[in-house]
């Protein structure tokens, strides 16, 4: 198994990445990246660019940039797609499906949910899409929370596309536990996205559902891991360690000042924490 974390750190060190990540929350956390392992990098790059991203290439690695998230594409063989892993799918907001279709992508609409649909990558990954007409985008914060950033879900999308959520399919009885874990570890805002329990971080809404079928870790799947960008990552890692987190890959700093660490949540979601991704980005879209 190749080391996608090491590759990403090398990429960030060697070359600036141009993207627009969300400003961090009080704990210094925001969404950073999705890292896919694919057989055909070029075909997948064309898909993500057609969806609305901007491509770049760094020392053999490919990244497609979106508001709030970077999509990294690494060539390799995975053990399967997101379906069957703890992270069932990811989702983006778009203004209209017609704009996506005009770019040459097919959108399968859900008849019972206006404004909700999906498109598929060349290797079969389902990417959920919500247009502004969708009725189930709203995020209601739990009592005692009033976060202005989380209110973005309750307004029309003012730009062509932005990252929206990842959806975790959890074992029975684990939804409340997962919601509490992400709230505590990353200082997230708990609430409900439509009828789903959820936790909001700048740039990402984490949705939780019970799943009767067993799931596996994201490690080695096509979506190998999620990435959060963190300010003062070393101190943040020490805080997580004090809370009992065991790191798969401990905090490491590269020559150019970027840093990373990697952990797995209690249900198998592999999460890379990075620092320096934001300072290497640009507001250019």
Where are the predicted features?
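A short local loop/turn or secondary-structure capping micro-motif enriched for an aromatic residue
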Residues: 79-83, 135-138, 213-218, 279-282
